């Protein structure tokens, strides 16, 4: 019994452990300060981009996401069509077919992984924060003709966000959520189900 009283709760090395924890806490605080400085500089640079305010009008697309997309995309003037950027991001559609076999159409995943990441983050954020993107996501996943899985819907929305960003940067137009909702095909009076 006396051995147990002496062995439990040894205090050897507690001072060294305390010093190590203090050092790690200081490192975390220093890194947080550096991150804040970098984000501040990033936000300033983002505001210098022409038409950035128009793009930031999209709910869910913030300065961090926009900076990530534009950094990976590069100069917009080198692209003649938005499909070139879609292909650069690896979101171009490819069909897996051979001979008489026709496989499913999937995104290629060939291209800039980080651009694809930022576009997907923009899609997730827009679906969470913007009503028009929520409606689109719901429409794509619940439509009667060819409903998409949730991930497929997010990829389609990411491509749509890319097209919106491309159009704003090329033409200088403002973001209009009503144009976005034109994809939703609502049943007309002749297509509406008859109530029995």
Predicted regions and their residues:
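A detector of single, family-specific signature residues
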Residues: 1-196
């Amino acid at each position: 019994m006396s051995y147990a009283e002496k062995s439990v709760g040894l205090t050897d090395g507690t001072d060294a452990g305390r010093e190590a924890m203090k050092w790690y806490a200081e490192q975390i605080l220093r890194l947080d300060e550096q991150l804040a400085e970098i984000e501040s500089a990033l936000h300033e640079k983002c505001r210098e981009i022409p038409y950035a305010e128009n793009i930031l009008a999209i709910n869910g697309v913030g300065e961090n996401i926009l900076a990530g997309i534009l950094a990976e995309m590069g100069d917009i003037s080198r692209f003649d069509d938005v499909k070139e950027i879609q292909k650069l991001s690896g979101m171009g559609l490819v069909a897996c077919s051979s001979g008489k076999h026709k496989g499913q159409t999937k995104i290629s995943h060939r291209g800039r992984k980080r651009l694809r990441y930022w576009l997907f983050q923009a899609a997730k954020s827009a679906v969470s924060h913007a009503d028009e993107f929520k409606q689109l996501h719901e429409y794509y996943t619940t439509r009667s003709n060819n409903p998409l899985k949730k991930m497929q819907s997010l990829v389609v929305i990411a491509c749509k966000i890319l097209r919106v960003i491309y159009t704003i940067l090329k033409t200088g137009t403002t973001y209009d959520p009503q144009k976005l909702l034109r994809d939703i095909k609502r049943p007309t009076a002749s297509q509406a189900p008859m109530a029995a």
